Amino acid sequence: MSNSTATASAAANIALVKYWGKASVENNQPATGSLSLGLEDLRTTTTLEYATGDQDTFDTELDDKARRRALGFLDRIRQNHQIAQRLHITTANNFPTGTGLASSASGFAALSLAFDALFDLRLARSDLSRVARLGSGSAARSVYGGVVELISSED
């Protein structure tokens, strides 16, 4: 662990061709491919810092469902990378949440990118896309930005 804070940003995206169904619910893996366009001016920015206590904390107000989803995601990626450190999370969108603009996609992509930077994991974009997908299927596309085609595969 070489950093004590990391900030990352990711764009929302809009699917031009949506995926249908899931090949794996556990890994949030789509059954079919998809094509999207990154909405580069609509972004989520997330900052992660080491928490001082034994729980993750948020600067941002989240409803219970969103909080549980984010905490479950963090627990899973911490376990996958054998990291015990608890985090303080600050996250904000520069666009309205819950309006169909894929804020969960940009949110989980930004969270994945910040986690990678904080713990100096140096994951390849394709691996970061798989990590982000655990939080939101569309986040796999937001990791890349721009025009993205994701092809359904075994992983």
Which residues fall in each region the model found?
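Histidine/cysteine- and/or acidic
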Residues: 107, 111, 122-130
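ATP-dependent small-molecule kinase catalytic core of the GHMP/sugar-kinase superfamily
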Residues: 127-155
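Active-site nucleophile and cofactor-binding loops and adjacent substrate-binding regions
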Residues: 102-103
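ATP-binding N-lobe of GHMP and related small-molecule kinases
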Residues: 1-99, 113-123
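Stable alpha-helical structural segments in soluble proteins, enriched in small hydrophobic residues
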Residues: 106-118, 135
